[in-house]
Structure formats: structure tokens, C-alpha cells
């Protein structure tokens, strides 16, 4: 990749060369991206994708890098991170939100407008684009419950509006995962509610999260999808794995469904510990755990 030419051509866009992705991931692990692009507008995203297409460069998108592990060898693609695109607009009972906006911020803007429906997401640390990508959910709610449409940039450079039907949401999945495209903005349909009741529910869910989840350590959030008929955390507990340390990573003593970075863990520590958990759970209970966390990048 000719990074000098890219910097010269896209000189108005923030481009970081050989940027360690441990600086942006919630696990505080991960190798460097050859180029990390931080667009501030839809137009800048279009320009980056157009340049990559013209030069034959591959690209990928990161949301808030919360439910993500980047391997220690890093990423050779152009990495596009949308955290600078974070406008949140409210129009009646509709919210129009840039993909890089934090989901937590979005829920509190809904509260400020006395809008109900987003309470379930008040503690989910991801971005709005990432939440649409994986149909994020918690405490009985999912993004699909409030989703109306998304503005998406396709790989060929065209922008398309996709509906709930188009995205075919299911558990921790949307059609965005099958398409090489970028969520630029999402529209959500909420309802008018009582401010005090909305706040009380959000406070209750926040308290639950703080009580049950290891928020005091870096982590990638929930590591595994919930297998049918089981609770992942209980399987890991019953297997005697809770508290297991692997390098600088550890299965949380607070919630066995989380792996925390307790001592300068590497992405390799995380990936190997995940594989070990999967192997043990398969052997003991004949249950195959599938990762919810997205694992990308190259080995060292």
C-alpha cells in the first residue's frame, strides 16, 4: 500500500499510519492498522471507499471497537472507524443517528426527549452502526425492536436505504454481516413515554449491569452467543473454568461470560483462552459455543 499517495490524495481526512489498534479497542489489545481512517462526514467515507476501489485496496469498518478482538499482527486493510460521525437528531418520536454515535449516548438523548423503547440499550458500549450490524441486545430488548431503516454505503459506492425487512434481523445477526457495506446512519422509531418511568428503568438496568458485569477491567463484552437451552456463564462455571487466567487475560470472577484484561493481555491470550473454553465446554457438555465477539486481523 502506498500510504504516502493515500495521505496526499485524501489530505483533508484524518489518516493514521501504522496505528496500534490497542489504542481504540475495549480489550486494550491488538496490532497496528496499516492505515486507520477517521472520517467526520458521509462524504469523507465515500471518498475513502472510492479511493480504495480505484487503487484495489481492501477496507473494513470498525464501530466503537467494543465487541471486538484484533489479533496481534494487526490489519493490512484500510480500517475505517466512524467514531467521529456522531450526530443524534430527534424528530417527534423518530431518532436519526450517525453510525459512529455511541449507543449509550443515543439512549440518553431518547430519555431527554421522553422517548421510550431504547431503555434496554442504556449500558451497551458499542456504536449505533455496530449495534445494527450485530442486532445488539440486552435485558429482553434488541435493536430490531426499534429499528426503522439505515442509510448504507455499498462497496460499489452507491448509497441505499435498507429497511428492517431488508436486514432480516435475528439473534446477534443482520444482513449487514453478509454484505461488504457501511452503515452511515440509522433511523429508529420510538414512542412517547413518561420521563420518570424511563429514567427509573434505565437506572435499574444500569445498576444491574454494574452489579453483574466486570466493568472495572478492559474486556470485549459478552464473548459467546447464548446456546439454545443453556446460559453460557453457567456452563463455564460448571466446567470449573471461572477465574482461569491465560497470560494476562482471565475469565471474569464476577461474570463467567466475560474475559477481562487483568495484566497487559495480548490478543493471542484472548483468542487462545476462547478456544480453550470452547474445547472444554464441548468435551464436558457437548455444547458448541459460538463467539459473539468479532475476531479479525492477522497473527504475529
Swiss-Prot record:
The keyword Transferase does not apply. GO terms for cellular component: cytosol. The active site is at residues 172, 222, 292. Residues 28-193 form the FAD-binding PCMH-type domain. The lineage of its organism: Bacteria, Bacillati, Bacillota, Bacilli, Lactobacillales. Pathway: Cell wall biogenesis; peptidoglycan biosynthesis. This is UDP-N-acetylenolpyruvoylglucosamine reductase. Keywords: Cell cycle, Cell division, Cell shape, Cell wall biogenesis/degradation, Cytoplasm, FAD, Flavoprotein, NADP, Oxidoreductase, Peptidoglycan synthesis. Its cofactor is FAD.
Amino acid at each position: 500500500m502506498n500510504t504516502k499517495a493515500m495521505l496526499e490524495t485524501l489530505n483533508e481526512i484524518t489518516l493514521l499510519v501504522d496505528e496500534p489498534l490497542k489504542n481504540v479497542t475495549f480489550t486494550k489489545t491488538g496490532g497496528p492498522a496499516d492505515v486507520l481512517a477517521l472520517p467526520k462526514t458521509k462524504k469523507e467515507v465515500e471518498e475513502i471507499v472510492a479511493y480504495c476501489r480505484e487503487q484495489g485496496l481492501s477496507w473494513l469498518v470498525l464501530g466503537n471497537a467494543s465487541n471486538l478482538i484484533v489479533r496481534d499482527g494487526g490489519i493490512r486493510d484500510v480500517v475505517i472507524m466512524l467514531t467521529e460521525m456522531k450526530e443524534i437528531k430527534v424528530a417527534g418520536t423518530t431518532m436519526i443517528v450517525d453510525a459512529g454515535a455511541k449507543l449509550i449516548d443515543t439512549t440518553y438523548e431518547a430519555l431527554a426527549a421522553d422517548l421510550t423503547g431504547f431503555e434496554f440499550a442504556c449500558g451497551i458500549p458499542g456504536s449505533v452502526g455496530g449495534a445494527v450490524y450485530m442486532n445488539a441486545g440486552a435485558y429482553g430488548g434488541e435493536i430490531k425492536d426499534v429499528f426503522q431503516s439505515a442509510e448504507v454505503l455499498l462497496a460499489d459506492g452507491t448509497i441505499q436505504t435498507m429497511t428492517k425487512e431488508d436486514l432480516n434481523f435475528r439473534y446477534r445477526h443482520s444482513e449487514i454481516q453478509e454484505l461488504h457495506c457501511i452503515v452511515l446512519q440509522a433511523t429508529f422509531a420510538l414512542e412517547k413515554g413518561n420521563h420518570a418511568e424511563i429514567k427509573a428503568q434505565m437506572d435499574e438496568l444500569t445498576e444491574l449491569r454494574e452489579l453483574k458485569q466486570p466493568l472495572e477491567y478492559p474486556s470485549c463484552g459478552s464473548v459467546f452467543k447464548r446456546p439454545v437451552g443453556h446460559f453460557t456463564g453457567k456452563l463455564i462455571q460448571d466446567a470449573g473454568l471461572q477465574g482461569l487466567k491465560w497470560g494476562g487475560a482471565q475469565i471474569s470472577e464476577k461474570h463467567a461470560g466475560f474475559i477481562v484484561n487483568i495484566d497487559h493481555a495480548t490478543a493471542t491470550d484472548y483468542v487462545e483462552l476462547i478456544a480453550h473454553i470452547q474445547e472444554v465446554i464441548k468435551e464436558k457438555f457437548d455444547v458448541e459455543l459460538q463467539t459473539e465477539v468479532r475476531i479479525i486481523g492477522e497473527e504475529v
